[in-house]
Amino acid sequence: LFELARDCGRRVELAVETKHPSRFGGAVEQALTDLMDWFGWLPTESNADPGPVRVMSFSGRALTRIRHRSPRVPLVYLVEKPTPAATRAGLPGHAATLGISVDLLGASDWLGRIGARGHGLHVWTVDDVGRIDDCLAAGATAIITNRPAEIRRHLATLTG
């Protein structure tokens, strides 16, 4: 996947989710940051570009491990339930973005509180164009879908 993104001739951003990383004691995060470094995509203090990879996880510990390896990698904390205790005081692992299921849109006002703190909002998996307005109303900064062409066409009709 990294090779395809590198070789496609234009910038492609990758959202990499670490699945159940806690079982491996940091090996997943180590391997991922090593791969990012090998491709030259591990952000450094001297490089203003955070790179094309953002890391997503349901594990705050995994995000903290990534943060320790490279403080500038964009991080997304994924949640499955509204108002998780972990997000009341901010996002774990120094994540700048909250990632939620499309089913959580409109669940309560907790998304507004997250946005008021300046955090981004990623919504997954949005395959129904009828949910786009909900995503935009919630302040989504990214929409994750299995139907990118269809979603892009719909977004184009909204922006003219």
For the regions a language model picked out, list residue spans one by one:
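Short loop-to-alpha-helix "cap/lid" segments that border enzyme active sites
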Residues: L1-G160
